[in-house]
Amino acid sequence: MSSAIELKKQVVAEIADKFRASKATVIVDYRGLNVAEMTELRKQLREAGIEFKVYKNTMTRRALAEIGLEGLDEVFTGPNAIAFSNEDVVAPAKILSEFAKTHEALEIKGGVIEGSVASKEEIDALAKLPSREGLLSMLLSVLQAPIRNFALAVKAVADKQEEQGA
């Protein structure tokens, strides 16, 4: 009997560690997806470096209580799967949201973003943001624009002076 309890304590500790380490966690209801669809979803998530696990709701609730995250108890009803991302905050929301568009059985229920509980609406809003790489390229474009414009202005002045001098 005590070995079963110890095993459950280890699982609760594992779940708590995953929630602590993850930058973004998305909870979904996967009821209605067949094996092929689940395999496809797991593959997409794995390629993005996201861990996708199914845990018992009671163990997940205990892990959340252990780390002090409140407000997710109502989410953990029925069959749930949890996507943990330790690197990219946007990736799990984006991948799961895109998958849910083509597979109506998948329902995003909520999540945790950088230690704060997030509603379904907040996860959907996060999914609409560009990826980290996209945001960095936008930032780089914004930073390069003044330099490029300055270089073009200097070139135009130089060309004009060259025309006047010739």
From Swiss-Prot:
Q: Which GO terms describe its molecular function?
A: large ribosomal subunit rRNA binding; structural constituent of ribosome
Please indicate which superkingdom the organism of origin belongs to. Bacteria
CDD domains, alphabetized: Ribosomal_L10
Protein role:
Forms part of the ribosomal stalk, playing a central role in the interaction of the ribosome with GTP-bound translation factors.
Could you tell me which species this protein originates from? Answer: Geobacillus thermodenitrificans (strain NG80-2)
Q: List the disulfide bonds.
A: none
Please name the InterPro entries in this protein's record: Ribosomal_uL10, Ribosomal_uL10-like_sf, Ribosomal_uL10_bac, Ribosomal_uL10_bac_type, Ribosomal_uL10_CS_bac
Put simply, this protein is called: Large ribosomal subunit protein uL10
Q: Which Gene3D superfamilies match?
A: 3.30.70.1730, 6.10.250.290
Q: Which UniProt keywords apply?
A: Ribonucleoprotein, Ribosomal protein, RNA-binding, rRNA-binding
> GO CC annotation: what is one?
large ribosomal subunit
